Structure formats: C-alpha cells, structure tokens
C-alpha cells in the first residue's frame, strides 16, 4: 500500500510517516515547509514533494498511484 501525507514535514505528518513506514507502507508526501522541516523526515525512505496544498495540479501529479491520502497539513499558530 502507498500512503500520501500532506504536511509530512510537520509534527503530525512526520510521526504518521514513521508509523506507516514501520507498518511496511510506501510513504510519500508534501509540505510547503512554512512550519515543517525536512529534518523531521527520512528522505532516503520517503518521496518528498515541496508543494503547497493549494497547487492542485502539482498535488494531483504527486498523488498518482497512491492508495491512501492522509491530510495533516494545516497552518499552526501559537495560542490557537
């Protein structure tokens, strides 16, 4: 199974990526890197796309062949 995670370089997305890698999934995902960091993911095991979720054309292209999508992208702000 192949899972695509939006917001993959953030706290939630990167932990989901680790979980699914351990379960044997193929993992790919995107992040605009506004709040996330590439240091949070293992790029040797994860296909990473620097895409804003509002870029539907690029997002659609990156999701080709994906079985599951997990949407973890969000704008995070202190005090919410």
Question: Where do the protein language model's features map onto the residues?
Answer:
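N-terminal Rossmann-like NAD(P)+-binding domain of SDR-like oxidoreductases, especially those catalyzing
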Residues: 1-80
